[in-house]
Amino acid sequence: MVKQIDSKDAFQEALDAAGDKLVVVDFSATWCGPCKMIKPFFHSLSEKYSNVVFLEVDVDDCQDVASECEVKCMPTFQFFKKGQKVGEFSGANKEKLEATINEFV
């Protein structure tokens, strides 16, 4: 399941609640073509990796979160463990997304 983040507080709470689990954050926008293309794959990964927390942040709805996380383009995927960012990449690259999850799990 992918959790929609709607505020900076909700983002921090989700990171805190994850504990030792890997957190994968998809920063996207409704008007972004590549974001729309990879979204179903991102959701399918959330079913496949039940021990990983998947979050979605709409950069237009949560500009403060996107700014704090220094998101420059969409889609950007960031990876967190114990509240700390451990990885990041931009672009709708399915293979890289799954490989990066496997690297940190």
Curated annotation (Swiss-Prot):
Residues flagged as site, Contributes to redox potential value: G33, P34
GO molecular function (one): protein-disulfide reductase activity
Gene that this polypeptide is encoded by: TXN
Function field: Participates in various redox reactions through the reversible oxidation of its active center dithiol to a disulfide and catalyzes dithiol-disulfide exchange reactions. Plays a role in the reversible S-nitrosylation of cysteine residues in target proteins, and thereby contributes to the response to intracellular nitric oxide. Nitrosylates the active site Cys of CASP3 in response to nitric oxide (NO), and thereby inhibits caspase-3 activity.
Protein's cellular compartments: Nucleus; Cytoplasm; Secreted
Positions of the record's site feature: Deprotonates C-terminal active site Cys: D26
Record has Electron transport as a keyword: yes
Sequence positions bearing N6-succinyllysine: K8, K94
Protein name listed in UniProt: Thioredoxin
The keyword NAD is assigned to this record: no
Stored SUPFAM superfamilies: Thioredoxin-like
Residues recorded with modification S-nitrosocysteine: C62, C69, C73
InterPro entries: Thioredoxin, Thioredoxin-like_sf, Thioredoxin_CS, Thioredoxin_domain
GO cellular component: cytoplasm; extracellular region; nucleus
Family: Belongs to the thioredoxin family.
GO terms under biological process: positive regulation of DNA binding; response to radiation
Top-level taxon of origin: Eukaryota
Disulfide bridges in this chain: C32-C35
Main location: nucleus
Entry comment on modification after translation: In the fully reduced protein, both Cys-69 and Cys-73 are nitrosylated in response to nitric oxide (NO). When two disulfide bonds are present in the protein, only Cys-73 is nitrosylated. Cys-73 can serve as donor for nitrosylation of target proteins.
Active site: C32 (nucleophile), C35 (nucleophile)
Quaternary organization: Homodimer; disulfide-linked. Interacts with TXNIP through the redox-active site. Interacts with MAP3K5 and CASP3. Interacts with APEX1; the interaction stimulates the FOS/JUN AP-1 DNA-binding activity in a redox-dependent manner.
Keyword terms, alphabetized: Acetylation, Activator, Cytoplasm, Disulfide bond, Electron transport, Nucleus, Redox-active center, S-nitrosylation, Secreted, Transcription, Transcription regulation, Transport
N6-acetyllysine: residues carrying this PTM: K3, K39, K94
Domain named Thioredoxin: residues: 2-105
